[in-house]
């Protein structure tokens, strides 16, 4: 099976982008080659731009508090594992405290580092980080992998509270999902929403099918069509075959 996730709200879209970028950051930092650590720096710069919204911190804190209140209401529910519930509540409390401790604009530690900002500026130019353009950067790349890794972790540390918050919220959101099995007749599927709005939609189907799902959703209807995934075509075409798939609606 292959699964695709589609954010329905802007908040969910930001959470998924943060998760994607932090995942890449962890991967490249864990590697040893200078090229990998160059990629890690580029991800840091992407994170700085992605999470620079002034209201991101407030949004995350608001959603964490809302989830905390909803979960606290389950404490006396005999169908809920108390130990698991308390563990999640502790994670939420820890993530909230770390976010509250953040001061200044997100990524300010990076913006105030002139050396890093020089690399960021040159990285936007094709081939702009050659050694003759940035000799001090070339020198840094020649240091041991562990020294570079420590630097990267130090630069990334002030950003990590948003990673923890995004991870917790996406975990709770995905766990809320309800899965249904459907068939898209001749590659098309429509479902009336009845005014119900979800935050995340997952579509899963046989990974042997050379198809891609295209989705549009609002509070009135959900439309999915499966199109050809063959590269080189001018325009993807909707398949003529019936497609069995799983649809998961996730909502806090």
UniProtKB/Swiss-Prot annotation:
Keywords: Cell cycle, Cell division, Cytoplasm, Septation
Localization per Swiss-Prot or TrEMBL: Cytoplasm
Origin species: Chromobacterium violaceum (strain ATCC 12472 / DSM 30191 / JCM 1249 / CCUG 213 / NBRC 12614 / NCIMB 9131 / NCTC 9757 / MK)
Protein name: Cell division protein ZapD
NCBIfam families in UniProt: PRK05287.1-4
Signal peptide: none
GO cellular component: a single term: cytoplasm
GO biological process: division septum assembly; FtsZ-dependent cytokinesis
Transmembrane found in the keyword field: no
Family that this chain belongs to: Belongs to the ZapD family.
Matching Pfam families: ZapD
Summary of the function given for this chain in its UniProt record: Cell division factor that enhances FtsZ-ring assembly. Directly interacts with FtsZ and promotes bundling of FtsZ protofilaments, with a reduction in FtsZ GTPase activity.
Known partners and oligomeric status: Interacts with FtsZ.
Disulfide bonds listed in the record: none
SUPFAM superfamilies associated with the record: YacF-like (SSF160950)
